[in-house]
Amino acid sequence: MVDDSTRKTLSSIPLLQIRAGPREKDIWVQRLKEEYQALIKACTYVENNKQSGSDWFRLESNKEGTKWFGKCWYMHNLLKYEFDVEFDIPVTYPTTAPEIALPELDGKTAKMYRGGKICLTDHFKPLWARNVPKFGIAHAMALGLAPWLAVEVPDLIEKGVIAYKDNC
């Protein structure tokens, strides 16, 4: 069952049509175009968030679209906690969701695998599996990483595991 917040997020991100991964070179280019369009439209979602002061990630990829990297951040008690984010597109994509990593948090929470990969198995991966090939990178960020940050970062801050770094 999907809650109202998830439904609202889903409605702001376009669903994808093309079922292709990095192995299908010709079709992969079309899927990448769809991914970028979804991210741009999700950026309308992000653009709306920017206007309200709650945008939270920036991404870019290598030329092939198989390695993604950037920054994500989480606001807690009016302080901005910023993290590097990275992931590779699996060769079995879109059947397999990307494993999003926050390398600097590696080993700091039980809800993380080696290399800083966040645990999405209980909540996000079943949702992804039901929505192949309609879900893409924008969905992984909004429905996978965002809720993880919302739960884990405040907990890590309260435990003193991560501290605010003034980037000025």
Curated annotation (Swiss-Prot):
Natural source organism: Drosophila grimshawi (Hawaiian fruit fly)
Superkingdom of the source species: Eukaryota
Protein purpose: E2-like enzyme which forms an intermediate with UFM1 via a thioester linkage.
MF-aspect GO terms: UFM1 conjugating enzyme activity
Signal sequence coordinates: none
Keywords: Ubl conjugation pathway
GO cellular component: a single term: cytoplasm
Pfam families listed in its UniProt record: UFC1
Protein name: Ubiquitin-fold modifier-conjugating enzyme 1
The UniProt record lists the keyword ATP-binding: no
Family in the record: Belongs to the ubiquitin-conjugating enzyme family. UFC1 subfamily.
One GO BP: protein K69-linked ufmylation
UniProt cross-references to InterPro entries, sorted A to Z: UBQ-conjugating_enzyme/RWD (IPR016135), Ufc1 (IPR014806)
SUPFAM superfamilies listed in its UniProt record: UBC-like
Active-site residue numbers: 119 (glycyl thioester intermediate)
